[in-house]
Amino acid sequence: MSELPPYDSFLLVSFGGPEGQDDVMPFLENVLRGKNVPRERMLEVAEHYKHFGGVSPINEQNRQLIAALQKRFDANGIDLPIYWGNRNWDPYFADTLRQMKADGKKRSLAFFTSMFSCYSGCRQYRENIIQAREEVGEGAPLVEKVRMGFNHPGFIAAMADNVSKAAQTIGASPARTKVLFTAHSIPMGMADNCDYEKQLRESCRLVADACGAVDWDLVYQSRSGPPSQPWLEPDVLDAIAEMDDAKKLESLVILPIGFVSDHMEVLFDLDEEAAQLCRERGIKMARASAAGTHPDFVEMICGLVQERLGKLNEKPALGELGPWHDVCPQDCCLYTPRRPPVAGGRPVQAN
C-alpha cells in the first residue's frame, strides 16, 4: 500500500446560501431535492430569505471565518492554503476540488461547519465529498475531516462568553436568567442513529457550568419535515410559551449552540419569531451570538488541525465523553429516510 501524501491544504466545508433574490428558489431546490418536504414549506422558507433581501449571511460569515483562520494559521505556523466548498451553493464541492486538483493539492484536512454528529451535519458531507471526488475524477485530492469539537475547551469558552455578553445587554447574568440552548431539529429516525442529542446535552451542560447558568434547557428549531414525521422537540417557540405560562419568565437568553454562524435560520427563527413572542409576553430577551469568529473558536479550529499535523501531544476535551474520533466508524450516523405510503401501500425505503 502506497504511503499517503502529507496534508497540503485545508477545506472549510459548509452548507451554502443564496446571495440574491434570484438565487433563493434554486438554492432551496438544491437543499430539498429528494426530501419529503411539502412545497408550501419551501415557499414559506423562501419568504424568510426574501425578507432579508434574498441574501443569507452564511457566505459572508464563512469569508470572515476564513480570514480569521488565515491569520491564526500564519501565527501558528500552519502552512496550509485555505479552500472553501459548499453542499448547496457556490462554491460547490466539485468546483472547489477541481481547483485544488489544478493547484496540485493531494490531501486536505477539512473542518465541517457543524459541531455535532448527525447524518446531515457529518455523514452527508462526507458522502457529498465522495461524490464530488468521483465527479472530478483521477487526481481529485483526498479529504479527511478533523474531529468534532463539541466539547473542546475553545468551543465551550466561546459559547460561555457569548451567553455572558448577551445576558449583560438585558441587565442580567447567566445565573439570574433563563438560558435556552437551541439546535436544529432533526427527524427522530436520524437522531436514533447518531450521538447528536448526547453531544448537545453534554455541550450545553459544559457551557452552563462555564458561564454559571443554573436554569437552562435544550430546545430545537427550524424543523422542515411533514407534520406526520416525528422530529426532535420541544420547539423553541412552544418551549418559551409553556415555560412562561407555568412560571412567568422575566428574562431569557437564547444561544444557538447548534449553529456555527448567525445564518438565516438563526435570524428568522430567533431574532424575528422568538423575539416577537417575547415582546408579546413581556419577556426581556437577548440572543447570544453563535461561534462565528470568536477568537477561542478560531483557535480551536487551529488546534484541531495541529492535532492532525502531529504538532500537539494531547487532544483537549472537557466533560465525560472525551475527545471524539478522528475517523468516523463505517456505520456512523447512518440514515435512510422513509418515503410516505403511496396509494395506501406500505412505506418504501429510499434508495
From Swiss-Prot:
Keyword Iron annotated: yes
Enzyme Commission numbers on file: 4.98.1.1
One Pfam entry name: Ferrochelatase
Keywords: Cytoplasm, Heme biosynthesis, Iron, Lyase, Metal-binding, Porphyrin biosynthesis
Localization: Cytoplasm
Catalytic activities: heme b + 2 H(+) = protoporphyrin IX + Fe(2+)
Binding of Fe cation, residues: H184, E265
InterPro entries: Ferrochelatase (IPR001015), Ferrochelatase_C (IPR033644), Ferrochelatase_N (IPR033659)
Pathway: Porphyrin-containing compound metabolism; protoheme biosynthesis; protoheme from protoporphyrin-IX: step 1/1
Biological process terms in GO annotation: heme biosynthetic process
Cellular component GO terms held in the UniProt record: cytoplasm
Entry keyword annotation includes Cytoplasm: yes
A single MF term (Gene Ontology): ferrochelatase activity
Principal cellular location given in the protein's record: cytoplasm
Xref: Gene3D superfamilies: 3.40.50.1400
NCBIfam families to which the protein is assigned, alphabetical: hemH, PRK00035.2-1
Function: Catalyzes the ferrous insertion into protoporphyrin IX.
Family recorded in the similarity comment: Belongs to the ferrochelatase family.
Protein name as catalogued: Ferrochelatase
